[in-house]
């Protein structure tokens, strides 16, 4: 049976999907997946400007996404490699190019989003759920929000910042995450 677990977005908004039935081995992959999620989100250097996704199949882990510094890529891979049940890690995490303009844009977007009243409750979290990845002035929003309104507001705020060339909105709502999890089981 083919089993695939994947995440949607950084804060590692954890949704797991399987293309076949659920058995003991699938449970093991789900446990590994949950451990990966915890390891990544508890990494102190993992910020709202990084986005990492993981997939697990029979203990083989594939990491994808983008981080702001090379040491983060290495540290995340090392953390995942040490998890019980992980056989092999394929690290496909990309390191974003160094750009002072992109750095300034990241911070402007983060300030604008988290100073909006719709996101005040998220701003005080240790790992806020909206992650902002900027590469060559192109913005990708990832993570989980509470509603479609929050998703649209975040996209609107990001797109209204000076210097933004495009916005890809990969934010998921709590309901979408819940629905994906229910389909899994």
PLM regions with names:
Residues 2-10, 14-185:
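N-terminal targeting leaders
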């Amino acid at each position: 049976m083919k089993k695939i677990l994947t995440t949607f977005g950084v804060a590692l908004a954890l949704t797991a999907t399987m293309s076949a039935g659920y058995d003991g081995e699938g449970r093991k992959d789900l446990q590994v997946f949950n451990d990966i999620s915890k390891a990544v989100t508890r990494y102190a250097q993992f910020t709202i400007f990084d986005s990492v996704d993981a997939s697990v199949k029979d203990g083989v882990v594939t990491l994808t996404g983008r981080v702001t510094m090379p040491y983060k890529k290495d540290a995340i891979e090392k953390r995942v490699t040490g998890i019980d049940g992980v056989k092999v890690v394929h690290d496909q995490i990309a390191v974003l190019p160094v750009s002072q303009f992109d750095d300034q844009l990241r911070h402007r977007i983060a300030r604008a989003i988290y100073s909006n009243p719709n996101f005040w409750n998220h701003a005080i979290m240790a790992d806020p759920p909206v992650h902002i990845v900027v590469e060559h002035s192109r913005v990708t929003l990832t993570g989980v929000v509470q509603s479609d309104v929050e998703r649209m507001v975040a996209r609107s705020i990001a797109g209204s910042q000076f210097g933004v060339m495009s916005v890809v909105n990969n934010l998921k709502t709590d309901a979408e995450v819940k629905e994906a999890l229910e389909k899994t089981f």
